[in-house]
Amino acid sequence: MRRGIIVEKNKKFVTLLTPDGQFLKAKNDRHSYEIGEEIMLPSETRMGRRASFFDFFKLRPFKMGIFTMTAIMLFIFIVLPVFSNNKAYAYMTIDINPSVEMALNSDYEVIELTPLNDEGQKVVNDIDDWEKTDFKKVIDDIITDCSEHGYVKKSKEILISTVYENTEDNTYKKAVKKQLNDVTEKYKTTYRMESLESDMQTREKAKKEGVSTGSYIKSNEKNDNKDIKDDSSKPSGEEDQKSDENEDENTDQTDTQDSKQGDNEQLNDADSGDQKEEKADDQIDDSDKDKKIKESDENTNTEKDGDHEQTPIQDPQDKGNENNGADKGQSQYHRDWNNGEQGKNRSSSRRDNASDRRNPNGYSSDNHSAKNEDSPSAPGE
């Protein structure tokens, strides 16, 4: 007799799976068989053959669906977590003098511990059981080992830099920062703890230069600060050129203003001189006119007095004296008249000279000729 489990049935036949992996087909004498039921068959009814991979595809769709769902669940709960725990989500470097880099998985566990120099290799060799250990515990072990070997002392700087594979995963980043802050708070009273973040491009550049990410960032910061100091201490060539151009423009403007001011002062001086000369000439003319008016008034008064008064009889000697006095008065009158004409000629000449200064093109004034033509002729001419 053979035993088997019913895996399929229809109205005529049932299919059995034997313990040795054979499929047997037998007649369905009883319609009350159930799938999964174990039954006994006579040996002569054996129709078996060994099960093959292709028999799986001959199962009914319902059974096929159940099997597929079971496989998916196994992959999600068994295979996928194993794969995820072996993937690096972040890289963290610790710089004391030994430099070590840790790779963290999704559970914040260390999956890789890489020394970055000879001292770092010694530290890695001294640490046991670091794989799949929380990164805070590994940091504690690294600091303790460095302290025992004299690599780190009190007040020395410990630099921790973190690089994330997926910079958009804010949940993971916040969790790492929180745990790293706990480590910093723990050691800040003993050492100078500093933490910073960077990106994958910076990490690759640091690897090419053979240094840690933190050391690479610090080195670039020093170079940038040095360049900034050099730039601030030395003015650029463009600024020098602009300042020189501004100074030249200011100098040209000052020279132009000075020249204009000098021309204006010369014109003002010439005008003031002309005005003074004209005033002096006018004063001389006024004085001459006053003298003439006074003399004419005296002569008029004398003539009137002669009409009303009888001329006294004088002896010849007195008459001769009077004639001499009259001749003297007439000569004095001629001298006064000549002096007035000379003063007018001098004032006219000065005005002509002033006019020449105001007219640099050389056009002469006709005032002198006009005045000479209008001036009265001397008595007796």
UniProtKB/Swiss-Prot annotation:
UniProt keyword Ligase, yes or no: no
Pfam families listed in its UniProt record: RsgI_M, RsgI_N
Keywords noted in UniProt: Cell membrane, Membrane, Stress response, Transmembrane, Transmembrane helix
Annotated segments matching region Disordered: 198-381
Side Cytoplasmic, residues: 1-63
Transmembrane segments: 64-84
Disulfide bridges in this chain: none
Domain RsgI N-terminal anti-sigma: 2-50
Compartments, record wording: Cell membrane
Effect of deleting the gene: Cells lacking this gene exhibit normal cell morphology and growth rate at 37 degrees Celsius, however cell diameter is slightly decreased.
Keyword Magnesium: no
Inducing or repressing factors: Part of the sigI-rsgI operon, which is transiently induced by heat stress. Expression is positively regulated by SigI via the sigma-I promoter. In exponentially growing cells, expression is regulated by the WalRK two-component system, which represses the sigma-I promoter and activates the sigma-A promoter, leading to the formation of a basal level of RsgI. WalRK can also positively and directly regulate transcription of the operon under heat stress through a binding site located upstream of the sigma-I promoter. Repressed by glucose.
Quaternary structure note: Interacts (via RsgI N-terminal anti-sigma domain) with SigI.
Protein name per its UniProtKB record: Anti-sigma-I factor RsgI
